[in-house]
Amino acid sequence: MRGTYCVTLWGGVFAALVAGCASERMIVAYRGAAGYVPEHTFASKVLAFAQGADYLQQDVVLSKDNQLIVAQSHILDNMTDVAEKFPRRQRADGHFYVIDFTVEELSLLRATNSFYTRGKRHTPVYGQRFPLWKPGFRLHTFEEELQFIRGLEQTTGKKIGIYSEIKVPWFHHQEGKDIAALTLALLKKYGYQSRSDLVYVQTYDFNELKRIKRELLPKYEMNVKLIQRVAYTDQRETQEKDSRGKWINYNYNWMFEPGGMQKIAKYADGVGPDWRMLIENEWSKVGAVRLSPMVSAIQDAKLECHVHTVRKETLPSYARTMDEMFSILFKQTGANVVLTDFPDLGVKFLGKPARY
């Protein structure tokens, strides 16, 4: 369900309404400075740190030996050379899953930017980015990344936030693993446990978000900020069990309906919509953007708005430059956090200094 009801609010009028919607405006480096260096590599994270991002984002999945791995998907096919290194380890569906490999095995893989596979040919998703397979990046664990960030903070005397997305908890439950519990335990080990700490935990899985809020945070004596990421139902992002115990596609339609954001607000501090969910594309043009009803719904629910994902390569027709896109999101939709592959441009737009 994409846009079940329609309310139009134009930027000039809405700017006054959103003044209290967001606190400090912040930039999250989505998978690091992924527009410049392969996503989720240490090089990508250190570049984003230097560029002045407020937070570094991590996608977290589990290995066969229960180690948290930083990777953009629980499927290895289109980000590593797994098909060459372990050609017989795919499942019946033809995919190679992180959870079927140990940390030692995963360390043997070369990591690169996301790509499409046609036969034996690899085509980058974003053709003008860092060349595929050069110079030979590797996957790493979530704990290694936390240690890396702590090291940067120690040597520079400058802090940066952690923005951790728990990937497909439902899939990990199917595999008999509790990725949410392991993620929270590791965050607490490194001192990320209260609302005053520089940390957000995000997931698409609303059922798991409720479990984190009701069960896991009290269990670990934690109170970190939670973000519900929003998807369209036809993206097939999440599964849940029906009344017969069968796993079925999760229906996100209610999040786009009246009262949806109020329901989310019972468990989350904010929501993470795609920017396309906030703007009526067919009715928008340069200098005149029409906002979707989700914008006012988020404000009415007093939720933080964390918008995904701004990229040079995917700017809409109504935003000619990255600055125009940041302006629309921060000043018209009322977003207080924008996730981007180009954190330096977001930092510059907000008038914040780079760290180096």
Curated annotation (Swiss-Prot):
It comes from the Bacteria. Keywords: Cell inner membrane, Cell membrane, Glycerol metabolism, Hydrolase, Lipoprotein, Membrane, Palmitate, Signal. InterPro entries: GP_PDE_dom, PLC-like_Pdiesterase_TIM-brl. It is an enzyme of class 3 (hydrolase). Residues 25-314 form the GP-PDE domain. Its EC number is 3.1.4.46. GO terms for cellular component: periplasmic space; plasma membrane. PROSITE patterns: GP_PDE, PROKAR_LIPOPROTEIN. It is a lipid-anchor. A lipid is attached at residue 21 (N-palmitoyl cysteine). Residues 1-20 form the signal peptide. Glycerophosphoryl diester phosphodiesterase hydrolyzes deacylated phospholipids to G3P and the corresponding alcohols. Binds human IgA, IgD and the Fc portion of IgG but not IgM, which may contribute to evasion of the human immune system. This is Glycerophosphodiester phosphodiesterase. The lineage of its organism: Bacteria, Pseudomonadati, Spirochaetota, Spirochaetia, Spirochaetales. The gene is glpQ.
